[in-house]
A protein has these predicted regions:
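Conserved thiamine diphosphate
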Residues: 151-185
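Thiamine diphosphate
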Residues: 2-160, 165
Length: 185
């Protein structure tokens, strides 16, 4: 990552620097202390570090796709100086294929999914790994059950793809989710 990209992140309106010591230039750690949920934190990083996303809304990852779509529609320019691209196909399987296609063109691609959506895109995930494509699959981990759908936390999404060949990084909190997201690119 170049120095100009790092400067853009910290000078962006996304990270307004307010508080004691800012006016005097005595900020020890640049950035903002803010309370946001995990989806918001991930999108703050993704929309700066990625070029394109293919996603189909599924709870609890729906917000990430919505926030990305809003940023793309508003003409947001990422740190590479590129406008964001968003594709919302007809299902999760197609979303994985779209994301793979975006990665094949050389774009920094991302996908947002969880639960049954991960299970549905399973075949496409193996194909992406087989082609050695690099993209980030942001998972809002949730449990999958046989009897009813639920949105309770769980690691079933992880176990669904643990043998697919994806590197999987787990965050213990919201800050770690943002940090690991940028590291994964």
């Amino acid at each position: 990552m170049s120095l100009s990209m790092i400067k853009k992140i910290f000078s962006s309106t996304l990270l307004p620097q307010t508080g004691a010591g800012v006016a005097a230039g005595k900020v020890k750690y640049p950035g903002v202390r803010d309370a946001v949920d995990g989806n918001t934190a991930v999108i703050h990083v993704e929309r700066e570090s990625s070029d394109a996303a293919g996603a189909y809304p599924i709870t609890p990852s729906t917000q990430m796709g919505e926030y990305w779509a809003e940023a793309a529609a508003s003409g947001h320019i990422n740190i590479s100086g590129r406008p964001l691209i968003f594709v919302e196909p007809e299902g999760e399987h197609a979303a994985a294929a779209v994301t793979a296609g975006l990665a094949m063109t050389g774009l920094r691609a991302a996908n947002f999914s969880s639960g049954q959506g991960i299970a549905y895109m399973h075949e496409s995930l193996y194909a992406a790994v087989g082609k050695r494509l690099t993209y980030v699959l942001n998972v809002g981990a949730r449990a999958m059950t046989k009897s009813t759908l639920n949105v309770h936390a769980g690691h079933d999404d992880y176990h669904c793809v643990d043998d697919a060949g994806f590197f999987q990084l787990f965050a213990k909190n919201v800050q770690s989710a943002a940090d690991l997201n940028i590291i994964s690119h």
